[in-house]
């Protein structure tokens, strides 16, 4: 399949890059390793508020992704989720990117908006866990309502586990929060809220325990087995298991493509966001230059910079004239 721009990464900056490309008349295909678009905003903290997005006093990460996707939708970007960009080959005037699902996309330019790299979830190290994934075992939450009046076990000791413990305690019949260490990594105020909630019997904290086994049938968990550090064991009846063990980022494929990487970031020219390979750009947290600020806001600006440079110097066709969006009514009708 052919397009104008391939965008690697469908976090907030990647989605906005698709919008910017479309606004300039460029077709975009977007590749992301996670099951749904949104990057860490969707996978790790969808219900957390972000306070530094212009025009919003506050907005949840999930709402920001929804708004960005709706904004880009008018230009019909094509999303390829649940797959990695594994190969990039340079042709005379274009690039061919191949994904882990054997999809090949040809484009005149590539924009890498991969955050800290392609992400995959750190999964439960239990051989049978894949049987339950997507049915009663989840590594992120898309629809909290499915946990209403259910018994939910949450495993993990960071912000995601703690935050979802607080949120789901309002919906679930019972929430168990499991951590392999005695001390959680969440903020002191969040942990204080968890301990207060534990007094209501809606939530129970079990530490230091690890999940040692899953029992159930047809993909539906019925029991979760825990092992303590001193050898004791506990079996919980449960309907769902949420495992928040973080994400594994990797830039390995990008290094293999010959892209110049320093300290796990891609070196770019701040004036154009271009890399050491002509036609390949990087924006968002993965891009590095002097005085770089790793903010979503900065990534939005870099997306515009890269797309305008591609439209002016690579795509060709009609004469390029910079215009403000207020003078592009024919595009937004």
From Swiss-Prot:
GO molecular function, one term: flavin adenine dinucleotide binding
Cofactors named for this entry: FAD
Protein name, UniProt field: Ferredoxin--NADP reductase
E.C. number: 1.18.1.2
Residues bound to FAD: 32, 40, 45, 85, 119, 285, 326
SUPFAM superfamilies (UniProt xref): FAD/NAD(P)-binding domain
Domain of life of the native organism: Bacteria
Catalysed reactions, as listed in the record: 2 reduced [2Fe-2S]-[ferredoxin] + NADP(+) + H(+) = 2 oxidized [2Fe-2S]-[ferredoxin] + NADPH
InterPro entries according to UniProt: FAD/NAD-bd_sf, FAD/NAD-binding_dom, Fd--NADP_Rdtase_type_2, Ferredoxin-NADP_redctase_2
Keywords (A to Z) from UniProt: FAD, Flavoprotein, NADP, Oxidoreductase
Similarity comment: family membership: Belongs to the ferredoxin--NADP reductase type 2 family.
Cofactor details (free text): Binds 1 FAD per subunit.
Subunit structure: Homodimer.
